[in-house]
Amino acid sequence: MPKKIDTEPLYDGDGPSPQEIKMNAGFQYELDLIKKLREEGFTVSDPAGADSAKADLELTPTYKNQIIKFELKEKLSADFAQMNFDFDTSSMQFTIDKNKASAQKEAAKTMIGIAESYGIIREANSHWQPQKNIPAKFTLSSSSSLDQRKAAHKLDLKRFPDKFLAKGSAAAQEVEKYYNSKNTYYIQVKGKGLFYMGRDPEGYGCPRFSSSVRESSIRIRIKTNSSSNARWSFLMAIKITGLGKSSHDLDKDANFLLKPGL
């Protein structure tokens, strides 16, 4: 089907100089934590790297011959997960091209997984009604002038308002469901510690992730990447703020991994 692909990179945050999200963001944190745990005698698999089938950290405990998976976050970015919408010019609806370069980043893969389970693309098409209001961004050609692009940007900002699809702890719970579908029930955030997602199958006694955030939301919006160069995207993103500190932290004392529930 004919498509207009949004080739804009994914950026962490707004403002005049947002930083592009790198393909290997957080990889050094994976390496450092794996090294630390191995030095402490834990059996840990090699880093996941680009292997999306593996968790960031996979540990085999001494008390059972079964891998325990952990998601690792070096930081809570401005957008926990995000992905730019593309546009299907035959059906005149927003869509997602999973094969484009930006879709291969972890922030995008997480967002796509949540989008599919939550129906975010359907919600975006229902809210924005692109069949009636064709996004000006996707009518531009490669030869469009800067003035034409600026006019299109201004028009899209006027016609496509933001919408929040989940607030409170609901978005954080969607994050938990996504990782649970990958058999991952724990998330370690640098500087915050370890949290369980959905349930605590190992009985570590750490706090629940979705109960430890002050606010979370799923948002569809236009994100301006550069006003001066008229670069923007139609975006879906999960924002998580105010994560409290956990009583458990893999970066500090990880001995609780040896005797869970005790």
Region locations from a protein language model:
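Acidic, proline/glycine-rich low-complexity IDRs
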Residues: 2, 9-12, 246-262
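Beta-rich catalytic cores
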Residues: 53
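Catalytic cores of nucleic-acid endonucleases
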Residues: 14-21, 31, 39, 71-235, ...
